[in-house]
Regions:
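Short S/T/G/P-rich N-terminal loop/turn motif that feeds into the first structured element of a domain
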Residues: 157-158, 177-207, 212, 217
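Exposed beta-strand-loop-beta-strand "reactive/processing" segments of non-cytosolic proteins
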Residues: 56-106
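Short, non-transmembrane alpha-helical segments in secretory-pathway proteins
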Residues: 33-63, 122, 126-139, 198, ...
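Short, surface-exposed beta-strand/loop "edge" segments at domain boundaries and coil↔beta transitions
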Residues: 85-92, 158-163, 197
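Non-cytosolic head/periplasmic domains of membrane-anchored proteins
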Residues: 109-183
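Intrinsically disordered, low-complexity coil/linker segments enriched for acidic/polar
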Residues: 82, 95-97, 128, 157, ...
Length: 217
């Protein structure tokens, strides 16, 4: 009987040892399954670099570890800028995703990199939404709204994105942004006292530049 238990104990130890070895191996396999290929990461880095260069925001470095997030998917790229570039461009300096000159750009996959995805990570969502809502008011007040469900900023190429950045940076001087990140809510935006007329003119200029599009459902 003692011999039986000795053999049984050895078998259990061998099985446990095997499981201990399999656990990190399984983790490595899963990690690689949720990781972009080196060629995709390289293409993503280059795509982001070229987009920012076309916007006159030349980066020093673009990088990503290529790991897809387990919850929700997607992966992060990090775009590093010089002090001069950050300090001379409010759109960068005031970006919620900028930390120590590094801009985090989240995309669903490397093929999703575009001017729209850059805008989505570069701009403050609260201010973007505020400008779209002000665009709705502008259309309504000027009789331009016709069964529109909502208005969006249309920034999908170098030309429109450059224009959009210029207007966005102007908007930053006309509003106060209240950080709601602590409660995980979109930031609240209010017009600075005495800046109402300038904001209305800004919205009109954005419309005339073709940056506000009415969408229908």
């Amino acid at each position: 009987m003692k011999q039986f238990f000795k053999v049984l104990t050895r078998i259990i130890l061998i099985i446990c040892g095997g499981l201990c070895l399999l656990t990190p191996l399984a983790f490595l396999i899963l990690a690689n399954l949720f990781k972009a290929s080196p060629s995709d990461i390289k293409k993503g880095n280059e795509a982001l670099k070229q987009i920012f260069i076309s916007l006159d925001l030349p980066p020093e470095k673009v990088e990503s570890n290529g790991s897809y997030q387990f919850e929700g998917g997607g992966l992060d790229f990090y775009v590093t800028f010089s002090d001069d570039v950050v300090n001379s461009h409010p759109v960068l300096k005031e970006s919620p995703n900028l930390t120590k000159n590094r801009l985090k750009v989240y995309v669903l996959n490397t093929g999703d990199i575009s001017y729209h995805s850059v805008e989505d990570n570069l701009f403050n969502h609260g201010l973007s939404q505020f400008l779209e809502e002000e665009g709705e008011k502008y259309f309504r007040e000027n009789g331009k709204k016709s069964h529109s469900s909502y208005t969006i900023l249309t920034l999908n190429d170098p030309e429109s994105m450059k224009k959009g950045i210029a207007f966005y940076e102007k908007a930053l001087t006309l509003v106060d942004i209240h950080d709601n990140s602590a409660i995980k809510h979109i930031d609240t935006v209010t017009v600075k006292p005495g800046k109402e007329a300038e904001l209305k003119q800004l919205i009109q200029d954005m419309d005339e530049a073709g940056l506000l599009t009415q969408k229908y459902q």
